[in-house]
Regions:
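Residues forming well-ordered secondary-structure scaffolds
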Residues: 33-37, 87, 117, 148-151, ...
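Gly/Ser-rich catalytic/binding loops embedded in alpha/beta enzyme cores
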Residues: 1-106
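A short helix-breaking turn/cap at a secondary-structure junction
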Residues: 120-185
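Structural signature of FAD isoalloxazine-binding scaffolds in flavoprotein oxidoreductases
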Residues: 111-116
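A generic signature of intrinsically disordered, low-complexity regions enriched in glycine/proline
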Residues: 15, 78-81, 109, 146, ...
Length: 185
């Protein structure tokens, strides 16, 4: 379902063989040993990783700034923030540099950048998407989709969602979001 679509992946998600710093200067040379479940599902569905996106150090801020990358700017107005901690994804989508993006949310880290950047983000309920091995693995962190439209977020969420054999917290059965709403007038 994602064949050939450009995907922006938040830097906290590891991809085997590629750098993943979680926005931290001490981790700037870290190379992923495994690919997170979310990224793996997107790749298996045909998405093409187009960008790695900025995040504040260890995804712990409502705006994106690090000693590693500096300040991430909102493409609609460079004096404004794209929010955080998935602000790099929000800015990438708002600039039109990718069609889809990954984020994660504890206290607004998908919702804040979506609002600041004029894109759509969805924090799924805990257990809908497998956690994998992101840095701040805990019960409050929910990986989720971001895109420029509700339809694209639903499409990406349907790819991300579902049980995973290595995450016992994933909810069964898989819940699928409808991609068409014919009964709504």
């Amino acid at each position: 379902p994602l064949e050939g679509l450009a995907l922006a992946i938040k830097d906290e998600e590891t991809i085997k063989g590629l750098p993943a710093s979680s926005g931290s200067l001490p981790l700037k040379d870290y190379i992923g040993e495994e690919t997170t479940f979310i990224a793996e599902r997107c790749f298996n569905a045909g998405a093409i990783m187009h960008a790695r996106t900025t995040t504040p150090e260890f995804s712990c801020a409502g705006f994106c700034h690090t000693k590693l990358w500096g300040v991430t700017r909102n493409p609609w107005n460079l004096d404004y923030t794209p929010g955080g901690s998935s602000g790099g994804t929000g800015a990438t989508l708002a600039a039109g540099a990718a069609t889809l993006g990954t984020g994660s949310d504890i206290g607004g880290s998908i919702r804040i950048p979506a609002s600041c950047s004029g894109v759509v983000g969805f924090k799924p309920p805990y257990g809908r998407n497998p956690q994998g091995h992101i840095f701040n693995l805990d019960f409050y962190c929910h990986p989720g989709p971001m895109a420029r439209s509700v339809a694209d977020v639903a499409l990406l969420q349907n790819v991300m969602a579902g049980p995973h054999s290595r995450d016992i917290a994933t909810v069964k059965p898989k819940m699928v979001l409808p991609l068409e709403y014919k009964s709504i007038k």
